[in-house]
């Protein structure tokens, strides 16, 4: 219930625990879409924000899109305030003296800026570049959710100045894995058609582990061209479990069961391959 959250110290402890177990945590600030929390924070704390140098004149709704509370603005004066606000947030969390984000890669999000308007595309592309530059100044690599088709391809804009950003490919309606690789982008396969689980929701509740074991490989992308097994730009694959909204009672144990099975089969197929003589039933006995 409520709004689960970590303090900065708790989040650092969680990352350090993962790193002690051999994992590299990738932290994400998913904006300018999915930004209701930031807009609400500014509205509720505007007087405190105005005490910060450089933010004395921020309007009450200074970073919000004028059409949706879920979106940060990417145009006009409010778009400039949004850039300034997010840059300040990244600078705080990537502070070299005491960083909150410990991994070597930071994800800037930028997916699902719903119903983007013609006068917002330039601002979106500028937002991507500005946030990437801000993260890179701290020595981190930058990643984003694959959205180049929407923001670049469909508008006839070249991506050549953005190939320093790694791409999490998640949807063929938002990006094209083969095209991005050919352009020089490093890509990660997290194709929603195969690898998404939406716990207790109206879409796929559980990743079809048996299907993944029998039919999937790291170069399997749904309707997005062909990526070759030896492609040096394919960094690997990952699975996703979106457990933030549930239409029915879901416990932490339910999520744990799903995540373990998803992660295990993805590891088997990505790192270990599959013994041609091993059946899914034999594999599943490991659990």
Task: List each model region and its residues.
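Active-site neighborhood of glycoside hydrolase catalytic domains
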Residues: 60-166, 170-185
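Short acidic, glycine/serine/threonine-rich loops at helix termini
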Residues: 36-43, 118, 155, 199-201
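Acidic carboxylate-rich catalytic motifs and surrounding loops in phosphoryl-/glycosyl-chemistry enzymes
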Residues: 30, 144-151, 278-281
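Flexible, acidic glycine-rich loops studded with aromatic residues
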Residues: 155-165, 172-287
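Soluble non-cytosolic domains of exported or imported proteins
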Residues: 5, 9, 76-80, 84, ...
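Feature activates predominantly on carbohydrate-active enzymes
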Residues: 1-107, 130, 134, 243-245
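Active-site-proximal loop/turn and secondary-structure-junction residues that shape catalytic pockets
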Residues: 29-35, 112-114, 148-150, 171-173, ...
């Amino acid at each position: 219930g409520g709004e689960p959250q970590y303090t900065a110290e708790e989040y650092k402890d969680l990352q350090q625990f993962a790193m002690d177990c051999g994992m590299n945590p990738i932290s994400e600030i998913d904006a300018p879409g999915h930004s209701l929390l930031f807009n609400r924070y500014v509205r509720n704390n505007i007087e405190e924000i105005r005490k910060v140098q450089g933010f004395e004149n921020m309007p009450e709704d200074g970073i919000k899109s004028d059409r949706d509370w879920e979106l940060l603005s990417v145009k006009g004066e409010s778009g400039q305030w949004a850039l300034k606000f997010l840059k300040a947030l990244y600078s705080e969390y990537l502070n070299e003296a005491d960083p909150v984000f410990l991994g070597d890669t930071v994800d800037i999000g930028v997916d699902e800026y719903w119903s983007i308007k013609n006068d917002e595309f330039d601002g979106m592309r500028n937002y991507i570049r500005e946030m990437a530059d801000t993260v890179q100044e701290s020595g981190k690599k930058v990643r984003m959710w694959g959205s180049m088709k929407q923001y670049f391809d469909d508008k006839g804009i070249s991506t050549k100045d953005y190939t320093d950003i790694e791409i999490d490919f998640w949807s063929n309606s938002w990006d094209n894995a083969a095209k991005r690789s050919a352009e020089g982008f490093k890509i990660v396969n997290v194709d929603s058609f195969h690898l998404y689980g939406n716990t207790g929701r109206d879409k796929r509740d559980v990743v079809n582990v048996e299907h993944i074991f029998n039919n999937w490989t790291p170069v399997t992308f749904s309707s997005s061209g062909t990526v070759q097994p030896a492609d040096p730009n394919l960094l690997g694959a990952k699975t996703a479990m979106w457990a933030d909204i549930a239409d029915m009672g879901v416990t932490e144990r339910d999520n744990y069961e799903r995540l373990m099975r998803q992660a295990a089969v993805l590891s088997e197929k990505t790192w270990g391959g599959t013994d041609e003589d091993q059946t899914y039933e034999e594999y599943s006995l490991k659990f």
